[in-house]
Regions:
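Phosphate-binding site of ATP-dependent enzymes
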Residues: 188-276, 297, 302-304
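Active-site nucleotide/adenylate-binding loops and adjacent lid/helix of ATP-dependent enzymes
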Residues: 1-7, 11, 19, 75-78, ...
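Hydrophobic beta-strand scaffold residues
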Residues: 35, 108-109, 137, 174, ...
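Conserved metal-phosphate-binding beta-hairpin within the catalytic cores
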Residues: 214, 223-225, 282-314, 324
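Active-site "cap" helix and flanking loop/linker of ATP-utilizing ligase/carboxylase catalytic domains
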Residues: 239-291, 319-345
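Glycine-rich phosphate/pyrophosphate-binding beta-alpha loops
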Residues: 90, 184, 240-243, 309-323
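ATP-binding N-terminal substructure of ATP-dependent carboxylate-amine bond-forming enzymes
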Residues: 1-115, 119-125, 144-161
Length: 345
C-alpha cells in the first residue's frame, strides 16, 4: 500500500508535527507500506523526502529543506497514494482545512471529518456543545475581538470597559486560552488582576476568540479514543504529572520533571466513568477515527472534561500511543487500524 505521511505546516505546532511524523514513520510496518514522507513548510509549500526512509529519524527541526524536494502539484501527487496519514497539528490540520481538501479530491486520509474537526478545534464551540449534552466542563467566559471592539454576550465594549467588566466577573485563579490553539500554546494561568491584561493580549496574538476559564483543582487525566470496525473504543486512563504549575507546552516537551503514569492510580469506578464520558463526548461531537480526551478528576470524584484533541501527538513521549500500548494495542497495530479505518470512510 502506498502511504504518504503528511507533516509540518504553518501552525505554531510545526515542530511537534515533525516529531510526531518521525515517530509514526519509524513504527509503520515497512513490509506493509510503501511510505513517502511529505513535508509542509511554514508557508504551506509541499516537499517530498528525498533520502532513505530510515534516515528521517535524523531530521532536525530547522534542517528540513536540505533533505526535501519541492512538489509542484501536491493534489495530483497525493492522489497517487492509497492513503494520507495526516500528522499536521494545529492550524490547517486539526481545524479541518486539509481534510476538506482531501474530501473534495476523494483522497483517503487518517483523521477526523472537516466539520467535526473545525468545531472541536474551537474550545468555545466545543464547550457549548458538550454542556448542552450534559457533559461537565470548567466554567468560563468568552469574548471575540472584532476590529477595535470586544464582544461579550452580545455586548460591545472598548478595551478599558471590557477589562473592567471582566475583572468583576471572574474569581482567580483562571486560565486564559486562545479558542483555537493546541499543545497548550498561548495558555496562561492568572492569579490576580495585575497579570490579566497581559495574558489576554498574548492570547489575542494567537486568536480573536478567547476564553477565560476557572482553574480546576484536580488530577489531570487522559483517555485515548479509537474507532475500529464500527466500534468506539476507549483506552486505559493515564495521568499527567506536570513539571510546571500546569501541563503547558514547555512542560509537555521541555521539562524533564513532567511525567506520565499509565495506567493512572485511580479507582476502577473513576476510570470507567472517565472512559464512558470520553466515548460520549467523541460521539456527541460526531468524531471519527481517533481523538485524545483530557479530563480533571476532582477530590470529590467529579469528572470534568478539559479538552479534546482530534490529531493527538504521536511523538515518542506522547500519551495517545502509550495509552493504547497499555491497553493491549501496540504502536504498529494502532497505525494499521487507523489506516484501514481511513480507507473505509
Amino acid at each position: 500500500m502506498r502511504l504518504a505521511v503528511l507533516f509540518g505546516g504553518s501552525s505554531n505546532e510545526h515542530d511537534v508535527s515533525i516529531a510526531s511524523a518521525t515517530s509514526v514513520i519509524m513504527n509503520l510496518d515497512k513490509e506493509k507500506y510503501d511510505i513517502t514522507p511529505v513535508y509542509l513548510d511554514r508557508e504551506n509549500r509541499f516537499y517530498i523526502w528525498g533520502e532513505n526512509i530510515e534516515s528521517i529519524q535524523l531530521l532536525k527541526v530547522g534542517d528540513e529543506l536540505t533533505h526535501l524536494k519541492k512538489i509542484d502539484d501536491p493534489i495530483s501527487f497525493l492522489k497517487t497514494f492509497n492513503c494520507v496519514f495526516m500528522m499536521v497539528h494545529g492550524k490547517n490540520g486539526e481545524d479541518g482545512i486539509l481534510a476538506s481538501i482531501f474530501d473534495f479530491f476523494a483522497i483517503p486520509y487518517v483523521g477526523n471529518k472537516p466539520v467535526a474537526s473545525m468545531i472541536t478545534m474551537d474550545k468555545i464551540y466545543t464547550k457549548d456543545i458538550l454542556e448542552r449534552n450534559n457533559i461537565s466542563t470548567a466554567k468560563y467566559i468568552s469574548f471575540t475581538k472584532y476590529h477595535d471592539e470586544y464582544i461579550m454576550k452580545g455586548i460591545s465594549f472598548s478595551w478599558p470597559l471590557f477589562l473592567e467588566n471582566i475583572k468583576k466577573k471572574i474569581h482567580y485563579p483562571v486560565f486564559v486560552k486562545p479558542a483555537n490553539s493546541g499543545s497548550s500554546i498561548g495558555v496562561i494561568k492568572v492569579k490576580q488582576d495585575a497579570f490579566l491584561e497581559q495574558a489576554l493580549i498574548e492570547a489575542l496574538k494567537i486568536d480573536e476568540r478567547v476564553l477565560i476559564e476557572e482553574a480546576i483543582l484536580g488530577r489531570e487525566l487522559e483517555c485515548a479514543i479509537l474507532e475500529n470496525n464500527g466500534e468506539v473504543l476507549a483506552s486505559r486512563v493515564g495521568e499527567v504529572l506536570a513539571g510546571d504549575e500546569f501541563y503547558s507546552f514547555d512542560a509537555k516537551y521541555h521539562n524533564q520533571e513532567s511525567k506520565t503514569v499509565i495506567p493512572a492510580d485511580i479507582s476502577l469506578e473513576d476510570e470507567e466513568k472517565i472512559r464512558k464520558v470520553a466515548i460520549q463526548a467523541f460521539k456527541t461531537l460526531n468524531l471519527h477515527g481517533l481523538s485524545r480526551v483530557d479530563f480533571f478528576l476532582t477530590p470529590d470524584h467529579q469528572v470534568i472534561l478539559n479538552e479534546i484533541n482530534t490529531i493527538p501527538g504521536f511523538t515518542t513521549i506522547s500519551m495517545y500511543p502509550k495509552l493504547w500500548e497499555a491497553s493491549g494495542i501496540s504502536y504498529s497495530e494502532l497505525l494499521d487500524i487507523l489506516i484501514v479505518e481511513s480507507i473505509k470512510k
